[in-house]
Amino acid sequence: MAVKKVLISLGHPAHFHLFKNINANLNNLGIETEFIIREKDVLENLLKNEDLAYYNILPKEKGSGFLALTWSILLRDIRLFKFCLRSKPDLIVGSTVEITHVGKLVNIPAISVGEDDMDVVPLFSRLAAPFSDCLVFPSICRMGKWTKKTLTYNSYQELAYLHPNHFRPDKKIVRKYFNPDYPYFILRLSALSAHHDKGIKGLDEETTNKIISFLAPHGAIYLTSEKKLQPEFERYRISINPIDIHHVLAYSQLLICDSQTMAAEAGVLGTPFIRMNDFVGKISYLNELEDIYQLGYGIAPSDKTRLFDVLTHIAGNRTKIEKNRLITCKVINKF
């Protein structure tokens, strides 16, 4: 049966970027697309900025506890089921658990897309992978017992939207916020509120304060955060249109974060990054970016000594920054 309509399910802002070019390509082929989302950070704003129609099946986040998560999945299953009965798509694709459940119920193929190893996201492995018709993941990922139903590719999700064929950094966009000719650093603090983030530590206030003090003599500091900040950090906070963040990231001297996605985005853009959280050493695609291609550093929250050794090496080090740009070009050409 020919595919005439595809339903794309988004559960994270990065998934908007992942699918935006795919969406355009499908439309150019005459295939109709629809978006289903749930509340997550700036996801809804990204679709609004691009004037893309969507249906939000979970306008308010339901909390992070087990009961809240169970109720959230049930609600999303029910609402997506009703939507599919009305819309009648030929294919469902995305990164959310509910597409696999509903796909089975309404007999519509569901393709799950991701980049985390299955042992890092055990809930997805238990609740989504068994019902998915196909899993599409980078070849570096550990897929465990789902290896046989996985279609792999030798690349990273981030290159679907940050490859030079799709993205060119523009200093004019950065100038809307500040002068990009003056050295600057980006700090990104994540909420770490996803189900697989339970018990995970990232950048704490004390470490953030010390990082700011260390970097201040070397350039401007701009901070973006998913969580509430202490008053002393507010003067560093900057509000950036979500659609512009990759331009800002591309010209930065360094990204320091506890976010997996933004670290990988910096890596493929050639911006050195320091990723500090308890996932360090556990996620294959980030291990590859950090250890094989040496585009960034993964540092455990407890290893403050190494953090400041790396900061000393990178801050103001134009050679390191230019080397990253060169390595990134070679990595991209490989893919």
List the predicted regions and their residue ranges:
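Conserved nucleotide-sugar phosphate-binding/catalytic loop shared by glycosyltransferases and other
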Residues: L10, N27-S72
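Catalytic donor nucleotide-activated moiety binding site of glycosyltransferases and closely related
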Residues: E50-G63, L105, L187-L192, N209-N241
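Donor nucleotide-activated moiety binding/catalytic core segment of transferases
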Residues: R76-L80, K227-M262
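A donor-sugar binding/catalytic signature common to diverse glycosyltransferases
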Residues: L91-V102, S112, I245-Y285
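A conserved, positively charged/aromatic
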Residues: I111-G114, V120-V136, L249
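A nucleotide-sugar donor-handling region in carbohydrate enzymes
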Residues: S132-K201
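Catalytic binding pocket for nucleotide-activated donors in carbohydrate/polymer assembly enzymes
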Residues: V268-H313
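Conserved donor-nucleotide binding/catalytic region of nucleotide-linked donor-dependent transferases
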Residues: T312-T328
